[in-house]
């Protein structure tokens, strides 16, 4: 795949091994894993960090292979998922940081362009999440309100 905002090819990355069942050394207790996911979320850990913690500390290489559900599905099932999807939240944090930087350095044209690209990506994601009903129909991204949304 090519890059979105550059005329270059993407970088190759590692591929997960094709498996149908969990390895013998892994932790495969479904109830314990689901409880651990909910507990980590209540501590304030994001969904992607939960996956890393389960992989590195608890020996769970793939949650979906063990439980049959993704981490996001488990979080919504237990009503502890965040109101704003994680990828959108991360982009909003990035845009706020760029806005703060541009407030202090108004002549930084490279980062001004990066802010435009990030905010364009935010608007595309908002449109997608409204279509999939993960965000309410009247939701719009406004930089002034983004800081308030993220502080919740």
Swiss-Prot record:
Mind telling me which HAMAP family this protein's record contains? Ribosomal_uS15_A
- Gene3D superfamilies registered for this protein in UniProt: 4.10.860.130, S15/NS1, RNA-binding
Keyword Ribosomal protein applies:
yes
The answer, when asked if Ion transport is one of the entry's keywords, is no
Q: In which domain of life is the source organism classified?
A: Archaea
- Lineage, uppermost ranks: Archaea, Methanobacteriati, Methanobacteriota, Stenosarchaea group, Methanomicrobia
Per the UniProt entry, the disulfide pairs are none
**What would be an example GO MF term here?**
small ribosomal subunit rRNA binding
Q: Which GO terms describe its biological process?
A: translation
Q: Where is this region: Disordered?
A: 1-25
To which species is this protein native? Methanoregula boonei (strain DSM 21154 / JCM 14090 / 6A8)
In terms of Pfam families, this protein maps to: Ribosomal_S13_N, Ribosomal_S15
GO cellular component terms given for this protein: cytosolic small ribosomal subunit
**Subunit and partners:** Part of the 30S ribosomal subunit.
What name does UniProt use for this protein? Answer: Small ribosomal subunit protein uS15
Q: Where is the composition biased (Basic residues)?
A: 1-11
Report the family membership: Belongs to the universal ribosomal protein uS15 family.
């Amino acid at each position: 795949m090519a890059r979105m905002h550059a005329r270059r090819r993407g970088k190759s990355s590692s591929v997960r091994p094709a498996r149908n069942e969990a390895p013998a050394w892994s932790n495969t207790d479904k109830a314990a894993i689901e409880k651990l996911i909910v507990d980590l979320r209540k501590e304030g850990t994001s969904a992607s960090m939960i996956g890393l913690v389960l992989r590195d500390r608890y020996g769970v290489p793939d949650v979906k292979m063990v439980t049959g559900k993704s981490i996001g599905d488990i979080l919504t099932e237990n009503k502890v998922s965040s109101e704003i999807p994680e990828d959108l939240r991360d982009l909003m944090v990035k845009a706020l940081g760029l806005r703060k930087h541009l407030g202090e350095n108004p002549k930084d044209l490279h980062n001004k362009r990066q802010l435009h690209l990030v905010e364009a990506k935010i608007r595309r994601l908002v449109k997608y999440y409204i279509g999939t009903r993960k965000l309410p129909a009247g939701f719009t991204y406004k930089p002034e309100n983004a800081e308030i949304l993220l502080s919740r």
